[in-house]
Amino acid sequence: MNQLEKSNFEQLQHDLWKNSGSLYCGNLYAKYIDDQNKRCPVWAFLEMISFGQYLYFYKYCAELLQNTEITERLYLMYTVKSLRNACAHNNCIINDINSTHNKRINADLQRECAKFIKSPSSRRRHLGHISTYQILTTMYAHQRICISTGVHKHICGELDELKKRFFRDNDYRLNDNIKATFDVLIRAIDTWFHIR
């Protein structure tokens, strides 16, 4: 923490202090942060910080280690964070399904998407829509980062249920853009998570 810029250090201290009364991590704060003489283990630190602070810490580690794989994962996680924030604030992800972005698309993600979006122009179009890009990036990041078979199995079950819900309301079949997006997401789930 001592290597942070003053503004980032103050923000981190504030975020940690906010958790001092938390039912879930207040005891960690009392044990490791209140007592200035103790060192806080990384696992406890990660339990107490926000997702944004976690990514800042992850970036620090990537720069310190000069590791390209960690850096690539970091940029995937920035996109995951955007989708997570939208979901946390109960935003309707498909409200404006045609909204585009100008972000550089991860080359590995493009290659993986080529397995189920054969046409290069169709792939560019789908990955160019921000909501589709964020959802596909989140699924791809899970594939690359999650090593727990139990968590992966649970996610497979959740995604199988999601596939069933996509066209539960027939209104979605009438909108070509939503139908095309859902079809791509179903193919991504089937390809990456082996759900049939």
Residue ranges and their predicted role:
Residues M1-E72, I94-N95, A141-V151:
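Short, contiguous, well-structured surface segments enriched in hydrophobic/aromatic residues
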